[in-house]
Design a protein with these regions (language model features):
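A short, well-structured alpha-helix characteristic of acyl/acetyltransferase catalytic modules
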Residues: 1-55, 180-192
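Conserved G/P- and acidic residue-centered "switch" motifs that form tight phosphate/ATP-binding loops
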Residues: 25, 77, 110, 140
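Amphipathic alpha-helical recognition patches that constitute DNA-binding helices
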Residues: 28, 96, 114, 131, ...
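Acetyl-CoA-dependent GNAT
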Residues: 46-106, 177-180, 189-191
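Conserved acetyl-CoA-binding loop-helix of GNAT-fold acetyltransferases
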Residues: 108-122, 141-149
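Conserved GNAT acetyl-CoA-binding A-motif
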Residues: 125-135
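Conserved catalytic-core motifs of GNAT/GCN5-like acyltransferases
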Residues: 133-136, 153-170
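Conserved active-site tyrosine of GNAT-family acetyltransferases
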Residues: 147, 152, 174
Length: 192
């Protein structure tokens, strides 16, 4: 890529944008996937090798039930995370959401809230989804508060559904429906 070429900004917000993941992003994705703190907080159990990163990229490029992006801060075009929709089940108009802000310096800056708004607007507005769901490791209180702030509601707990550090932990299931998302957009501004 030459200096004059610009990457496609797919979903654009005020401070961040989402763009399709590219091969050059895999070093960051792999670093985050192998970070012990991030793995603990997200429930990821398998380290990512270079071959695994290449397989991941191929999967997100070809899987019709998945869309995947990197989260980029507009100022400086700095990649800070990844986000996507997976297990899209078109007949029921449902999908699961995943987001990781892997750059720890970007934690607590509101980038995740903006990125998730962009992704949910895409899911509900463009893909015509009815329901977006996710799972959260029960001891990750910060993530639970974050998802509640952006409109997700707890709908159940998989008791002892996650094993980490020689102990079982709960896994909290959450979701947001299209009408709830639209009401938040019109009302309180999705936690902004």
């Amino acid at each position: 890529m030459t200096g004059s070429e610009e990457k496609v900004r797919f979903l654009v917000g005020e401070r961040v944008y989402l763009r399709p993941i590219e091969k050059e992003d895999l070093a960051d994705v792999r670093r985050w996937a192998n970070d012990p703190e991030i793995r603990q907080l997200t429930g990821e159990v398998t380290p990512m090798s270079q071959a695994g990163a290449d397989e991941f990229l191929e999967r997100v490029r070809t899987d019709k039930e998945r869309v995947w992006f990197v989260v980029v801060v507009k100022e400086g075009d700095r990649v800070i995370g990844e986000a996507g929709l997976l297990r899209i089940f078109w007949p029921w108009r449902t999908t699961d959401l995943s987001i990781i802000i892997g750059d720890k310096e970007a934690w607590g800056q509101g980038y995740g809230s903006e990125a998730i708004r962009l992704l949910m607007d895409y899911a509900f507005g463009y893909l015509n989804m009815h329901r977006v769901s996710l799972g959260v490791v029960g001891f990750n209180r910060r993530a639970l508060r974050f998802y509640e702030k952006v409109g997700f509601k707890q709908e159940g707990v998989q008791r002892d559904g996650y094993y980490h550090d020689h102990a079982y932990h709960d896994f909290v299931m959450m979701s947001i429906l299209e009408d709830e998302f639209r009401a938040m957009q019109q009302g309180e501004g999705m936690g902004s």
